[in-house]
Amino acid sequence: EYIMNMKYTITTPLYYVNDKPHLGSSYTTIACDAIARFQRLCGNTVLFLTGVDEHGQKIERTAESKNLQPQLHCDEITEKYKYLWDKLNISYDRFVRTTSEDHTSLVHQFYSKVLKSDDVYMGRQSGWYCVGCEEYKDVDEDDKSPICSIHKKELEWRDEENLFFKLSKYQDQIEKLIQIDGFI
């Protein structure tokens, strides 16, 4: 039996604005839209979010390659997403931009709580990094000019301070949860 009067929050990924929307963006958004519409038809309350992630080095570099300020580039691509969602009649309730004041304020509040929680620590991270993948890559230490196998571009050496999550702090709780039948 289906339970009615439930509350649902449905969100797409926040799409990177390093390039215009593509089929993968549409696919995910249409799937979320179908779920949101179904839940509304069932009488449930739905908050359907979509939006864009306007941070990252690949966005900055894309803007630079077009001789644009990063925010102007973000504004242009964001409008393309909104235009496409309107053309596809996507029924989102809120469009999130990671550069908006309300999002920035919420992130600052969350970040402040995380720092007080003792769940993170500062540490050094170094290695070969792919800007396109936004991740460190395992590379043979003899390779002096490694290439990303996905983007076919040279990796960059990074040595930086980052925040790390203290997963080990929750090891006992996680192990107990994993043992519960049906949890995973």
Listing of model-derived features with the role each one plays in the protein:
Residues M4-I184:
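N-terminal, positively charged nucleic-acid-binding surface of large information/translation enzymes
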